[in-house]
């Protein structure tokens, strides 16, 4: 009897399709053990087509589940069971930890949940299913046994990541972003109260060998011609001196091999502020075009709430340091949370305006989501801002200590939502850095004028957004229930700035296309 395994990640729309390293690693590991397996990223519209396409339906289907894909995964599981009631469905991913029993109690089509690193656990799960053995004592698996739910002990994390084969990549034509993810480590040392990464990541930070990382990047470049790499490491320089030495080794290895790659990676404010200029000079030379920094807030009250262990001035210093080395700063920012006050929102606006960051209305309207493993979720339960929390609870539905702040946010959010511009702004900024550095003559002759126009629009938009939201707060406080506030927030020019940026982006990408084809 053949035993075929399919692994899936579910996304909202085809435009969201990209790599998911978890299922890629598991697929490659299972294949190295002789099992027949594939992995796919699909959206809702593709579910039926994919399930109908199997000549021999999988005996085991594994699905990555996250809080924001919960309803899609529920729907997919229901469809799977209609096609094949005997197919074993296992869910996994960072957000399932501590909610394994809850998931099985509330999702009747799911047979088991995998906790922690999935490679060895899914392999043993498959082996037991193949040989029709009990799942009792299968480490890392919580499973349904008739009317009972049995939770086995967690499997120890894979400490030596270099023993894992490089994940196979399948260039998906729907992936328009044209970059590969690189997982150089697993685990996180951050203790942010809104996040559970430090719980789900396992035993501290586990590092891969820097030479092996560069080998993987070079192999992908030779095979697919892709020179852009985004590191998934929670913090590229962790842990401590060992992590910093590894980061420098990766940079040095890239430079010595003369590999002209474009790199994006995550870091933290307190890491940036303890590094010296030589590190960022080396990063720039190695091809780092963007550091994603967990800024999160521009006021001290929220930074303390998020347990960031930094100050507003620390954030400003870190931003300046990276920008001064001609590296773009992308950033996490949570402007609204259940404890927000208008004073703190105004401080966030002041911070963004004076920070030197590129920002749009999405940054200003960003609202905290409840991560299942976060300590802030526990505080919200204690403060009765949420009545209860399950894995399928709405991660954006909670009360505010100051309900008028939520009312303000909801009113504007209905009118303005420009999430898509985060990627666009970042892409523009990174392209400017890349071509100014690597093709200065072409940049000066063909691109400089357009990027200067974009810079002007960014500056004008920053100024407009600051004044627009500052005035909106003032009017709301004075005329909360009147027509003046609603009239004011509707009569805005935000979309005009966004359209200008989109037009200029398309203008320079046409030039880049012709340039690559030898036309300019």
Predicted regions, residues:
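Radical SAM [4Fe-4S] cluster-binding motif and immediate context
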Residues: 162-329, 350
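Active-site beta-loop-alpha junctions enriched in small/polar residues
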Residues: 66, 94, 234-236, 266-270, ...
């Amino acid at each position: 009897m053949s035993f075929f395994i399919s692994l899936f990640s579910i996304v909202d729309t085809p435009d969201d399709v990209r790599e998911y390293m978890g299922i890629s690693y598991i697929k490659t590991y299972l294949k190295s053990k002789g099992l027949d397996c594939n992995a796919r990223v699909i959206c809702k519209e593709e579910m039926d087509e994919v399930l109908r396409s199997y000549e021999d339906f999988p005996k085991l289907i594994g699905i990555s589940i996250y809080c924001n894909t919960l309803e899609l995964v529920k729907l997919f599981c229901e469809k799977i069971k209609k096609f094949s009631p005997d197919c074993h469905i296992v869910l996994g991913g960072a957000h399932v930890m501590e909610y394994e029993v809850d998931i099985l109690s509330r999702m009747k089509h799911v047979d088991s949940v995998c906790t922690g690193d999935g490679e060895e656990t899914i392999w043993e799960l498959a082996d037991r299913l193949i040989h029709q053995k009990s799942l009792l004592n299968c480490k890392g698996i919580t499973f349904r046994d008739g009317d009972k739910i049995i939770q086995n002990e967690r499997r120890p994390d894979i400490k030596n990541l270099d023993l894992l084969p490089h994940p196979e990549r399948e260039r998906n034509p729907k992936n328009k972003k044209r970059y590969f993810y690189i997982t150089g480590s697993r685990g996180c040392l951050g203790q942010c109260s809104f996040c559970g990464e430090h719980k789900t990541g396992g035993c501290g930070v586990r590092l891969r060998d820097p030479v092996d990382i560069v080998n993987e990047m070079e192999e992908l470049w030779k095979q697919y011609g892709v020179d852009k790499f985004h590191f998934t490491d929670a913090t590229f320089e962790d842990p401590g001196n060992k992590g910093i030495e590894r980061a420098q080794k990766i940079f040095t290895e890239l430079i010595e091999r003369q590999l002209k790659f474009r790199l994006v990676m995550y870091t933290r404010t307190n890491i940036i502020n303890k590094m010296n200029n030589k590190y960022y000079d080396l990063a720039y030379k190695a091809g780092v075009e963007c550091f994603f920094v967990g800024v999160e807030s521009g006021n001290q009250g929220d930074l303390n709430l998020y347990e960031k262990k930094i100050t507003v001035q620390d954030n400003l210093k870190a931003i300046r340091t990276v920008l001064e080395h001609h590296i773009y700063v992308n950033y996490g920012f949570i402007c609204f949370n259940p404890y927000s006050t208008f004073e703190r929102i105004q401080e966030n606006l002041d911070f963004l305006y004076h920070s030197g960051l590129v920002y749009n209305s999405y940054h200003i309207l960003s609202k905290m989501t409840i991560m299942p493993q976060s300590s802030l979720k526990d505080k919200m339960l204690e403060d009765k801002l949420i009545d209860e929390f399950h894995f399928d609870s709405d991660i954006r539905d909670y009360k505010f200590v100051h309900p008028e702040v939520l009312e303000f946010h909801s009113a504007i959010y209905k009118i303005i939502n420009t999430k898509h511009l985060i990627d666009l702004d970042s892409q523009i900024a990174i392209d400017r850095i890349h071509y100014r550095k690597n093709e200065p003559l072409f940049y000066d002759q063909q691109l400089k004028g357009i990027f200067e126009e974009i810079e002007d629009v960014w500056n004008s938009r920053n100024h407009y957004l600051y004044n627009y939201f500052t005035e909106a707060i003032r009017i709301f406080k004075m005329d909360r229930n009147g027509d003046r506030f609603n009239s004011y927030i509707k009569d805005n020019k935000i979309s005009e700035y966004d359209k200008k940026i989109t037009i200029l982006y398309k203008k320079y990408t046409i030039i880049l296309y012709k340039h690559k084809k030898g036309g300019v």
